[in-house]
Amino acid sequence: MTSKVYDPEQRKRMITGPQWWARCKQMNVLDSFINYYDSEKHAENAVIFLHGNAASSYLWRHVVPHIEPVARCIIPDLIGMGKSGKSGNGSYRLLDHYKYLTAWFELLNLPKKIIFVGHDWGACLAFHYSYEHQDKIKAIVHAESVVDVIESWDEWPDIEEDIALIKSEEGEKMVLENNFFVETMLPSKIMRKLEPEEFAAYLEPFKEKGEVRRPTLSWPREIPLVKGGKPDVVQIVRNYNAYLRASDDLPKMFIESDPGFFSNAIVEGAKKFPNTEFVKVKGLHFSQEDAPDEMGKYIKSFVERVLKNEQ
């Protein structure tokens, strides 16, 4: 296997964690607070970027500059992740994240309709919100996303044992003590080698052992398995999947990662959503780190077309 190497071009354009967080602001939400980036300009057109597991708003740092000339770009750190506060009850299930996210939306002075860009579990949150607030959604972009329930492990043979382990007591140790998702999974799902300062930005929120790492363990335990999964999550995914399959008037874009991690399986589900444009960028799971400019340009072009068609 070829060793990963640093990309000198990425070094030249590098944004460190402290530099990124300095651009962000914080807002009190319920019994905690949300840390977020807000470009503010073009407020009449808002695009909300949502990250997933093991990540933060930092993931989108090289993508959003492409979209900022045409829309207000807003990127939160999900509760308990990045620089956002901890949840009041110490729980980080899908519905906990959704509760804080929707309360935060109410405080943002958003336009009547928004565009979502969701990755990983961030796409799941975007889909769920879109299903529950169909009159507030202008378009959706998604990548490496949770598009449907998992009926059988035949669909995901490579990760069956991993998920069983994550759900066990050994999984608790693997994540809460050894920081599996941030220190092992995240860098393994990026093609290039992250600069030390970049990796430090992902690591910083989860440096301490124990409950601060709970969000990264809770997410994979939410995977919507029909047999053995959480019934409420399975129902949430069934609901938004049915809605998206019938959403002929809702523009969508699916960004496929090549060679990808989940993309090969997800693309078949995404094909069942009408009015979807398909594009492809290089990458494994976190293509924002391997092809940020390509991703940003695709999203900008899509957003521009959506806005033009509204006129």
UniProtKB/Swiss-Prot annotation:
GO terms for cellular component: membrane. GO terms for molecular function: carboxy-lyase activity; Renilla-luciferin 2-monooxygenase activity. This is Coelenterazine h 2-monooxygenase. Optimum temperature is 32 degrees Celsius. The lineage of its organism: Eukaryota, Metazoa, Cnidaria, Anthozoa, Octocorallia. It catalyses: coelenterazine h + O2 = excited coelenteramide h monoanion + hnu + CO2 + H(+). The keyword Lyase applies. It is an enzyme of class 1 (oxidoreductase). NCBIfam families: PRK03592.1. SUPFAM superfamilies: alpha/beta-Hydrolases. Monomer. Keywords: Decarboxylase, Luminescence, Lyase, Monooxygenase, Oxidoreductase, Photoprotein. GO terms for biological process: bioluminescence. Optimum pH is 7.4. Its EC number is 1.13.12.5. Residues 45-291 form the AB hydrolase-1 domain. Upon binding the substrate, the enzyme catalyzes an oxygenation, producing a very short-lived hydroperoxide that cyclizes into a dioxetanone structure, which collapses, releasing a CO(2) molecule. The spontaneous breakdown of the dioxetanone releases the energy (about 50 kcal/mole) that is necessary to generate the excited state of the coelenteramide product, which is the singlet form of the monoanion. In vivo the product undergoes the process of nonradiative energy transfer to an accessory protein, a green fluorescent protein (GFP), which results in green bioluminescence. Substrate binds at D162, H285. This luciferase produces light with a wavelength of 480 nm. In presence of a green fluorescence protein (GFP) it produces a green fluorescence at 509 nm.
